[in-house]
C-alpha cells in the first residue's frame, strides 16, 4: 500500500458513517423542544402528511427524487465542511496567536462555500439544478394550495443542507483544535472567542441578552 493509499484510507476513517450520524443527531436535537429548526420540521411533516395520497405516482416519484438529490447535497457539503473546518482552524490559530484580526462569521460562511472547490461545486451544482427542475415542474403542475406544501418540504431540506455544512465545519474545527492542544496547550484559550462565535452562529449557544429575552417571553 502506497503513502497515498494510506492517506485516502485515513481521510475515509476521519469522516465515516458515525460522523454523518452525529450530524443528523445534532440537527434532530435542534428540531425539537423549542430548537431553531422545530417549526420548519413541523411544517415539513404536516405538509408531507397533507400531500400523501393527493399526488399522482409521477409527482410522488418526483418528490422522492428531490429528497435523494437533497440528501446527496447534505453528504457533499458536510464532508467538505469537515475538511474546511479542519484546515481553517489551523490558520485561525496562527492568525489569532499572532494577533491578526479575524472576521469570524464571514470566514465561516466563506470556508463552507463549495465555490472554493471545483470538484465539490460541480457535484453540488448538478444536484441543485435537478432539485430546482423538479421544484419548477411541481409548481407548474400543482394548484397553489398544494404547491405551498412542496415549499415547506423544500425549505426543510434547505435548512438540513445548510446545517450539515456548518456542523461538518464545526466537527472539523473541533478536531483540529484538539490536535492543536497536543502541541500548544493554550490553544483552547487563544481560540475561545472564535469558538464561541462559531457556536453562536450555529445556534448552539446564546448571548446573555438572548437568554434573558427568551426567559422574559415565556
Stretch-by-stretch model annotation:
Residues 1-218:
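Intrinsic-disorder/low-complexity detector
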